[in-house]
Amino acid sequence: MQKPPLLLRRPLPPKFTKLSLHEKKTHTAKTGKIESLHVAFTEDETTSIKMDRTRFPDVLRNQSLTPINIQNIFLDHCVQERVTAISSPQKSTKHVREQIPDTATGSIFFPHCNSASTRIFGKQTNKMESSRKFKTMKDVYTEKRLENILILSSKFSKPKSTPGSVIAQKLEKMHPKHQPLPESPGYTYQHISRDLSATVPSPPPMTVSMKPEGQWPEHFKSTATLTLRVTEFPGFVSLPTPVLPRKPHRQSVIETLVTENGNIESVPKQIPPRPPEGLTKTEKIESEIHVVRGEGFKTVAATRYETITAMTNLAIVNCQVYGRNALNLKGFFILNCPDLTPLAFQLIYLNLSFNDLHYFPTEILCLKNLQILKLRNNPIKEIPSEIQQLEFLRIFTIAFNLITVLPIGLFSLSYLEELDVSYNELTFIPNEIQKLRSLEKLTVDGNELSFFPHGILKLNLTKIQFENNFTHPCFWRDNYLNNPQQLTQIISLFIVQNKLHKFYDKIPVEVQKLLKCTSRCEWCHGPKFGEGFRVIRSCDIFGASQLPVMFYVCSPSCYRRIKESSFVLDGSPSRRIALDVELSKEL
């Protein structure tokens, strides 16, 4: 026998009161800020709600939403359940924009399912709605709480006035969206809900005793019932880190350094692994072939001067190892010069300025190829004549010392080009300076000089500096005052100039000693006995003006001639040096 085809439609619902034909009013809710409500829901909670005949449209959300799986929908059945409903008297519906309070926790569910009567008579209702003209609704903004919204929570105590009971059984889960309907009307419905646990912390749940409720009254039995069960719920949700107050850059750097230092101190010291005990003696000898052993100076236990001495010795070793020809020990404040014999044929430059050397360092004399020597700012009082051993010395600086006399050996340096003896205690310069025929620059500032010797006119100087001395013309008169000559000196000069000693065959020994000429006249270049007569003449030479030059002459006649002369010969007939006649007449 052929079975009639199954009808795939729902059974007719019980009779309802006649629906009014007025236009269905819709509720629209827009929220700009999520605020906390009083109740929330979690997993495995079954709740039902009384569905209004009006339906709620989707609510706009800016964040990701969690789907809710509705297991079964029982139509016109009385089931024991726990109901949480927030109801309010019906008012005229408009587009409503609500503010959700900040205390809202858990999840908020906005129903999107139509009532049973709407689903059954949906076609007729749609026709009636299409025949009516759509009216624009005004937007209304309110600060009141949202109404007609279901709030579900796993731990929630409903008010005593709300009818309902706890459901004792769990319904089966149905995953496919399109399946034949079973005897008990049920289907799977994906709905969008809002999870606020990621942004707002949940307060502790309220503990209110729940009492089982009795059966629903008759006027509630005609309502549609929704049984919800959450199957998918977000797992662990990380809360955003609180925004700390802004710190100044300097404070942040200090805290970072303190943290790093604490981490360094907390790190345990690494103990090097011990070598295996099974190594033989031959292996130890082979491993020690490439080991470099030496001793370094320790500044912790040593004094300051010992440290400085070690540094100077290290500098000498570096010059010796790397073949350096210059050694700079400037500003070490050493008391004694280190041993320079390892660099005897290597160094050509040595700087010992700004130290505490009280004596001229004789260790320098071993440097055979030394060309530049600087001893500036040391308390040296004397230069030894042995300095002539530095044959190739070209530049010699010994300024800001305590030198009183220039040795004769200094004028034996035939290659000397620059001589700086400024700011010492020199009272005169020997006439032997004329031997320095290579000298080009002479600096004698800050001494006690009143004049220069006659021999300086024989040099080929390009520059001379003599500031801060007693060379002004007002000091000349005190320096060239002459004493009368002795009678023996006058007679000796007369005998020698007239060659009278040749007329005598035998001359006493004492007279022979008196007739021996010890010096020459700087004007006539004849013999001069005794000190002679002194005279200062001003010269404009070597780029300087009024350079005072002292002349020692043999007789009053030479004294008168040099005073009246406008030039002087430097020993060679081809060279004449102009003299300032007017200045000499004033004196």
Swiss-Prot record:
One Pfam family cited in the UniProt record for this chain: LRR_14
InterPro entries, per the entry: Leu-rich_rpt (IPR001611), Leu-rich_rpt_typical-subtyp (IPR003591), LRR_dom_sf (IPR032675), LRR_domain-containing (IPR050216), LRR_R13L4/SHOC2-like (IPR055414)
A single GO BP: intracellular signal transduction
Gene3D superfamilies: Ribonuclease Inhibitor (3.80.10.10)
First and last residues of every LRR repeat: 251-274, 344-367, 368-390, 392-413, 414-436, 437-459, 487-510
SMART domains to which the protein is assigned, alphabetical: LRR_TYP (SM00369)
Keywords: Leucine-rich repeat, Repeat
Domain of life of the organism encoding this protein: Eukaryota
The protein, known as: Leucine-rich repeat-containing protein 63
Provenance organism: Homo sapiens (Human)
